[in-house]
From Swiss-Prot:
HAMAP family: Riboflavin_kinase. It comes from Methanococcus maripaludis (strain C5 / ATCC BAA-1333). Catalyzes the CTP-dependent phosphorylation of riboflavin (vitamin B2) to form flavin mononucleotide (FMN). Belongs to the archaeal riboflavin kinase family. Its EC number is 2.7.1.161. Pfam families: CTP-dep_RFKase (PF01982). CDP binds at G10, L11, G12, E13, G14, R15, I109, Q110, L111, R112. Keywords: Flavoprotein, FMN, Kinase, Magnesium, Metal-binding, Nucleotide-binding, Transferase. This is Riboflavin kinase. The gene is ribK. GO terms for molecular function: magnesium ion binding; nucleotide binding; riboflavin kinase activity. Mg(2+) binds at T39, N41. PANTHER family: RIBOFLAVIN KINASE. Pathway: Cofactor biosynthesis; FMN biosynthesis; FMN from riboflavin (CTP route): step 1/1.
Length: 127
């Protein structure tokens, strides 16, 4: 399946959460890559239901009495307008401030830099 969306700025929280060792280790286990510390946010025209694609669920954890929630991961390919792509994953935390129209994507590299992406650029996601 192919879906299209626009690159948008995030809240800056992806860098913090992806950088936490338990998340980083879990993402490596589930995706096969060590994620770059940050996410690429992609806004869709319609709500996206990750559960329609059999995502992999992961549990939360606790650090120094603070609870961090689990979520779901779905492996994808992300393409820029030139057809260049990166194997990555959609991450859907159980607790998020994003709408169901915004996807958070992790990858082993900085996607904006590697795929020359700026806000409003259209990307293709292949599931």
């Amino acid at each position: 399946m192919e879906i299209f969306g626009n690159v948008v700025s995030g809240l800056g929280e992806g860098r913090f959460f992806v950088g936490l060792t338990p998340y980083k280790n879990k993402f490596e286990e589930l995706t096969g890559f060590i994620p770059f510390e940050g996410t690429l946010n992609v806004k869709l025209k319609h709500n996206f239901n990750l559960d329609n694609f059999n995502p992999i669920e992961f549990d939360g954890f606790e650090i120094n009495g603070k609870r961090y929630f689990g979520g779901k991961v779905l492996l994808i390919k992300l393409f820029n307008k030139h057809g260049n792509f990166v194997n990555c994953a959609i991450v859907a935390p159980k607790k998020t401030d994003h709408s169901k129209k915004t996807l958070e994507i992790i990858a082993p590299i900085q996607l904006r830099k590697f795929l020359s992406l700026n806000n409003s650029n259209v990307v293709k996601i292949v599931i």
